[in-house]
Amino acid sequence: MNLILGVLNPIALQLGPLAIHWYGVIIASGVVLAVVLALREAKRRNVGEDDILNLILWALPFALIGARLYYVIFEWSYYQANPSEIIKIWHGGIAIYGGLIAATIVFIIYCRKHFLSPWLVLDIAAPTVMIAQAIGRWGNFMNQEAFGAKTTLHFLQTLHLPNWVTDQMLIDGAYRQPTFLYESTWNVLGFIIIMSVRHRQGWFKQGEILLSYIAWYAFGRFFVEGMRTDSLFIGPLRVSQILSLVLFFGAMGLWIWRRKQQTLPDYLEGNTLRSAVK
């Protein structure tokens, strides 16, 4: 990683006029890891490799569009004045929640059409998305975005961060809270917990790994978002905090309701819809 005046160079490779940014490289790395993990788990749950690959091919472009559209909508005053910036995602400005919503819609439609349990497929995907998000936040780090309020060098040193991380948090003449790191760490912790218990007999019904992911991520995101300085707002309210509250209580409420109202298949049973149709 080259340095620009003590700051990490956001460009990984320059090929003539083509610049390959670390932001894209890091996000792509997270996606690749997520795909590998999802394929491994899908085999155990009687979901075909082709189904996973097809889902990814459909979901990724819509997730990218959804993530960008979400951001543009809530920053419309800027993009209305600068329409050429709308497609320049390498400048940053994609919202995770928008991407997750779009990808989930694609997953549900595909599963209904191909006799797959949407709950099961989303269970398989959820922890892999979580680790991809954790990795992707380091793309924000390279772009010096998604940071928090002003802090001191002394505070950052108490976190025992490498010097290159601390130096990157010097933005516009002031040290900033590394909120990208807080969210990344929260996601890694959630990933480890879910991966450690998801194969235990009787722990999860289908759909509950997904709901665990939603509740875990939304809970952490609510507090991290409160520290950020680049939040999207509706009036005085932070959009992501509102959505985090809705998702957290919605996920917990749906978990309780499903347990009370339905006889649910166990996660370890895998996909039974396709065999039932045959």
From Swiss-Prot:
The chain crosses the membrane at residues 18-38, 55-75, 89-109, 207-227, 237-257. InterPro entries: Lgt (IPR001640). Its main location: membrane. GO terms for cellular component: plasma membrane. Pfam families: LGT. A 1,2-diacyl-sn-glycero-3-phospho-(1'-sn-glycerol) binds at R137. Keywords: Cell membrane, Membrane, Transferase, Transmembrane, Transmembrane helix. GO terms for biological process: lipoprotein biosynthetic process. Belongs to the Lgt family. This is Phosphatidylglycerol--prolipoprotein diacylglyceryl transferase. It comes from Latilactobacillus sakei subsp. sakei (strain 23K) (Lactobacillus sakei subsp. sakei).
